């Protein structure tokens, strides 16, 4: 009965002090490590570094970090994620250790270093002027295509064949069988006879005879 009264008092004070506050101002010095043994396996445990997450025992000796839905925070007293209006900061690890098997370890909070402003003095810079050496134009070479020398073709003149008839032998050789110029030539007719005698005419027409008498046939 006494423990129930103490829990009710803690809930009332926490709800009165932190109701409607999503960012808790409670200063936690330690965080818990749950071995997930015994009845602790059915309990959801707070993560003091980030109330958007919590620990759940998926099996004996194996806690797993779970995420709350967006814009919700884990409330240990309700064992669920709630909105800002119903958020209640979790009790300290030392308080939970009195009734559970959790272990408390020192909480190392990340420190945020203050931003440092570095003053920089612009140094005077002297512009460096570089003079480019004069460029010598490179003579351009014009390549011209020279026509190939052509060799004129020489045409050979056609061969001329000369037939030389042998000249008759001259001199004092033996006599040949050449015709003698003393033989007289045959006579040549002065007029060709183109008239031939006309053949005789047709024989005279034979005399005509009278019509023969008709033959009378005798009847038996």
From Swiss-Prot:
Tissues expressed in: Larval peritrophic membrane.
PROSITE patterns, sorted: CHIT_BIND_II (PS50940)
Name under which the protein is recorded: Peritrophin-55
Job description of the protein: May bind oligosaccharide structures.
Chain coiled-coil ranges: none
Residue span, Chitin-binding type-2 domain: 33-95
Glycosylated residues (UniProt): 29
Bias (Low complexity): 116-165
Species classification: Eukaryota, Metazoa, Ecdysozoa, Arthropoda, Hexapoda
Keywords, alphabetical: Disulfide bond, Glycoprotein, Signal
InterPro entries: Chitin-bd_dom (IPR002557), Chitin-bd_dom_sf (IPR036508)
Signal sequence segment: 1-19
Disordered, as annotated region: 116-220
Biased composition (Pro residues): 197-210
GO cellular component: extracellular region
Disulfide bonds: 68-84
Superkingdom of the source species: Eukaryota
Post-translational modification comment from the UniProt entry: Glycosylated.
GO MF annotation: an example: chitin binding
């Amino acid at each position: 009965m006494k423990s129930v009264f103490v829990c009710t008092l803690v809930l009332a004070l926490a709800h009165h002090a932190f109701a409607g506050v999503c960012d808790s101002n409670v200063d936690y010095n330690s965080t818990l490590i749950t071995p997930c043994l015994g009845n602790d396996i059915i309990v959801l445990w707070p993560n003091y570094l980030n109330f958007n997450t919590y620990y759940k025992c998926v099996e004996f000796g194996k806690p797993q970090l779970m995420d709350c839905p967006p814009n919700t925070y884990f409330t240990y007293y309700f064992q669920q994620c709630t909105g800002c209006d119903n958020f209640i900061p979790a009790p300290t690890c030392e308080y939970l250790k009195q009734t559970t098997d959790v272990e408390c370890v020192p909480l190392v909070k990340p420190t945020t270093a203050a931003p440092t402003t570095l003053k920089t003095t612009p140094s005077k810079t002297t512009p460096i002027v570089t003079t480019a050496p004069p460029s010598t134009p490179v003579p351009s070479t014009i390549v011209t295509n020279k026509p190939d020398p052509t060799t004129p073709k020489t045409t050979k003149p056609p061969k001329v064949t000369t037939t030389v008839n042998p000249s008759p032998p001259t001199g004092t050789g033996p006599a040949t069988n050449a015709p003698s110029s003393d033989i007289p030539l045959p006579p040549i007719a002065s007029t060709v006879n183109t008239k031939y005698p006309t053949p005789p005419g047709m024989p005279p027409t034979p005399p005509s005879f009278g019509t023969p008498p008709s033959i009378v046939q005798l009847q038996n």
